[in-house]
Amino acid sequence: MDKLIEIDKITAAYGSKVVLKDVSLTVWKDDFLGIIGPNGGGKTTLLKVILGLLQPVSGSIRFYQDGVPVSSLRIGYLPQLNNIDRKFPISVWEVVASGLAAEKPRFRSYTEAQKLRIDEVIRQMGLEELYTRSIGELSGGQLQRVLLGRSIVSRPQLLILDEPNSYVDKRFESRFYKLLEEINKESAI
């Protein structure tokens, strides 16, 4: 099994407040990991360090592809739902498509293959009937599925989920877990 991420003695802080101290972790290609702890325990901070959104005070993080060190990985990210502006005028299709933004030239249309991939992910999430709806019209669970679609449309090597089932409705919950099992065949979670 190939190593994907190696975190070695990371310390992270916000100003003078240390949130993580000497954290080490190795993530392997087919891993499905959960990080649990109390509110304010540093879970989201660790995710921010992995995503490159927060520079650690000390320690190192290394990424690998096929056992070879690389500067970065394709990472999909599903944020906590409370970080989303529901008033932003964007459709379900556009949100999922935005997960491919780095793969298309600016101000150009998506390729036919990309459009097919976007449509495939929308179907996979069970959102076909909401295709053109604005995100402001969606329930919390529907929006969570849209954001999950955005995070996987690029076929990431690593998928980071921050409180992924907090808004998933009971009707979709078992399908959600099966979906994560399917995604884990292509991505470490």
Indicate residue ranges for each PLM-predicted region.
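Helix-to-loop junction immediately C-terminal to a conserved catalytic motif
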Residues: L51
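Conserved ABC transporter NBD signature motif
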Residues: G59-I75
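Conserved ABC ATPase "signature" region
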Residues: T111-L130
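Conserved catalytic motifs of ABC-family nucleotide-binding domains
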Residues: R155
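Catalytic Walker B motif of ABC-type/P-loop ATPase nucleotide-binding domains
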Residues: L159-E163
